[in-house]
Amino acid sequence: MEKRSKPNGPRRVLLLTGASRGIGHATVKRFSAAGWRVITVSRQPFPEQCPWEMGPEDHIQLDLGDPVATEAMIPEIRARLAPDGGMLHALVNNAAISPKGEGGARLGTLAMPADGWLRVFQVNFFAPILLARGLVDELARANGSVVNVTSIAGGRVHPFAGAAYSTSKAALAGLTREMAADFAPRGVRVNAISPGEIDTSILSPGTEKIVQEQIPMRRLGRPEEVAQAIYFLCTEASSYVNGAEIHINGGQHV
C-alpha cells in the first residue's frame, strides 16, 4: 500500500529542479497528490499565479548554471528543510538545457561554442552532484533517494538533441552509477530515468517520423508516465533498486 504524508504527521519532502513544464510539472502534481511537500528550484522567481498549492517558502530562485551560486545556496536549502526535521526524502535533478542554433538547428560538436559546452555541463551534469553532495546529510537522515533525469540521447546520436546535451546526459548516467556506490552506505539510493520522446512543449519538428519508424509502441510518452517512474524510485516500492537507469521510451532503445 502506498504511504502518504499525513496532514498532521511528518511530511515527506521533495526537492525538484526544472519544475515549470513537461516532466517537472507532472512530477510536482504526482508527489503533491501523495501528500509530499515539494520545493522547486528555478532561475525564475516564485510565480504569483502558481498552479500548485505552495508558497514562496517552497520555491528557491537559483541559476543552476552558476556553480558558485549553486553551492552557496545549500545552507538556504537546509534552512527550508528545518521545519521537517532537516530531512530530504527525495532529490530529483530534472533541470536541463539544450541550446539550439539559428532556426532551431542542432548544434553538433563543431558548431557548439566553448562557453555553450561549459554552461550545458554545469546545468545538466555538475549541478546534480553539487546539490546531492551538499545535501547528503539531509538525504541520509531520511533514508532518501536521488533521481537523475538522463535521456535516450545519452546513448545514441539524436537527430535533434545537441552534442553538448547528449554527452552531458551520458555523463550523468555514469555519475548515477558512481553516486549509487558512494551514497548507498549512507542509506541513500541513487537511480536515473531515461526518457525518450515525451509529449512536451519542447518537441522538435520531425518527431512524428521518429514515432512511426523507431518506437515500437508507435506513440509519444506522456509526462505523467515519466513522473510515475520517478515516484516509484522515491518510495519503498523500489527499496532495493540502486544504480539503475530506467528507460521510458516505448521500446525506442531496443
Residue positions per predicted region:
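Short, small/polar-rich loop/turn modules that mediate ligand/substrate recognition or access, typified
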Residues: 143, 184, 189, 241-243
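Conserved glycine-rich cofactor-binding loop
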Residues: 20-21
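C-terminal substrate-recognition "lid" of short-chain dehydrogenase/reductases
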Residues: 222-253
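Alpha-helical segment proximal to the catalytic Tyr-Lys
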Residues: 137, 181-182, 239
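Substrate-binding pocket helix/loop in short-chain dehydrogenase/reductase
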Residues: 102-118, 211
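Conserved NAD(P)H cofactor-binding loop of Rossmann-fold oxidoreductase domains
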Residues: 94-106, 251
